[in-house]
């Protein structure tokens, strides 16, 4: 929105939740838009935008529930068919449903045989309940690192599109998202925000559920470097490449050196060491050593 406004010489005011990633804020401002932060969710930000529009006469561009927005995002579906004409399954990260609605409409128009799968974060999955109720249902609470798809309720348009055009709505856990983000960074050399890797997360979690050839739509790179580091570390722990150990050893010179020597001999890379001499769980004459290790995988971690 900010870039389009800049290219057209128009003014743009963008509303975001207070939890929006810093890179997203900075990039939006760099394109010349005014940014207002308000609330904890996209729903809160949308309500603030609508109040602003009512007071100023500005036009609201809905983040997902508008025919033009859905049509624009549908061009992704056209690109999928151009680049992978033999595709059998398209998997799309989904929040409010604008992207999957557009992709499904475009793909179905040309290839009605292609299976369309929407993927939501399991702690912010607004579509299952809404589809069951036959109307948008507001989630009572959301808690996910995937802020870009943390939407409390779908729109009327997107719910209708998903009901009529999407074959399945799947959910992924925070662990799945962490693993997928690590995979994208390490294997695909892509920096993607947690919301953008939801489709990849679904594929990695249950690859046999998707008929190949499969296209996973990777959408969104707005991630704070600090969060990226945390998620990558969490992902490494989830796949058995980070190992934390608490050891009780005799309180005498050389004990810590002996522990570290054993770990080095086992081929583990020591990332962090903490040494505690006092504590209710310690016996007299012993200390606790806490170590964080990098291993080559779950088998190596078990050996260590």
Positions of PLM-derived features:
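Small/polar-residue-rich loop-to-helix segments that shape phosphate-bearing ligand pockets
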Residues: 13-89, 107, 120-173, 177
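Short glycine/serine/threonine-rich phosphate/pyrophosphate-binding segments
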Residues: 1-8, 21-25, 70, 93-104, ...
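A glycine- and small-aliphatic-rich helix-loop capping segment at beta-alpha/alpha-beta transitions
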Residues: 4-15, 105-115, 134-137, 208-209, ...
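Active-site-adjacent helical/loop segments in soluble small-molecule enzymes
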Residues: 56, 155-212
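Short coil/turn connectors at secondary-structure junctions
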Residues: 8-11, 31-33, 55-58, 65, ...
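A conserved regulatory-domain signal marking ACT and ACT-like small-molecule sensing domains
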Residues: 225-304
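Buried hydrophobic positions in well-ordered alpha/beta secondary-structure cores of metabolic enzymes
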Residues: 5, 28, 61, 80, ...
